Amino acid sequence: YGLNQSVEFKKNIGPQLGELELNKISKVKELNFVEKLSPVYELIKLVSSSQLTNNKTIIGFVGAPWTLLVYMMNRKSPKLNLNENFFEDKYLTDEVLKVLDKFLKIHIKNQIDNGAQIIQIFDSWAGLLKEKNLPYFIYEPTLNLVNYTKSLNIPVICFPRGIKNYKDFCEIVKPDTICIDYEIDPVKINKEIKIPVQGGMDPKVL
């Protein structure tokens, strides 16, 4: 939406995106992007200035580059069908990842400027990737966001849902906290990882 790719949410289906046009998303201006997402920043500012946040920490959220890339190029949830043809178009994936890196950093900065005290990076579809593709699609682009956020003196939580090796992810990407999915043994992961661990609860329990 913020990058001029149409999106709508359909009941029992999820997000449905329009055609990805590189010439359109690469020409998006920062001012227009921020204006489209201004309701997010205004809400964070409203919450941060209210008494509800006394002794509480406000978390800002961004989608990870890989998960956003999947939605933008697959044009729908990959849960039932992932079009893997885009793995073959290196130029397109490179260019889209560059655009995402630029505007995710803008999105992070605006959330922080309006009161977010922690940033959480959601990678809902990290588990779709094979080990050989992790450095290009997940480790490098996520590390860029983590380093940028830390440079603003803001801690980072990462949630690479379904990733095969949380230990490797933490050692490479270096988040301050890792969020695990409910299929991971929290006792085992707590022994392997030397940073705070959260999550691990089946959504059905909630």
Task: Give the residues covered by each predicted segment.
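Alpha/beta enzyme core
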Residues: S49, N74-I121, L128-V156, K167-D176
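Short, small-residue-enriched loops and turns at beta-alpha junctions
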Residues: W66-L69, A126-L129, P135, V156-I157, ...
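Catalytic-face loop-and-helix region of soluble metabolic enzyme cores
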Residues: N147-L206
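Active-site-adjacent beta->alpha loops and helix N-cap segments on the catalytic face
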Residues: Y41-E42, L129-T142, Y182-I195
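Beta-sheet entry/capping signal
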Residues: N55-I59, I118, T177
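Active-site-proximal, glycine-rich beta->alpha crossover segments in alpha/beta enzymes
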Residues: K10-N110
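Short, well-ordered beta-to-alpha junction loops that form the rim of enzyme active sites
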Residues: Y1, G60-P65, F122-S124, R161
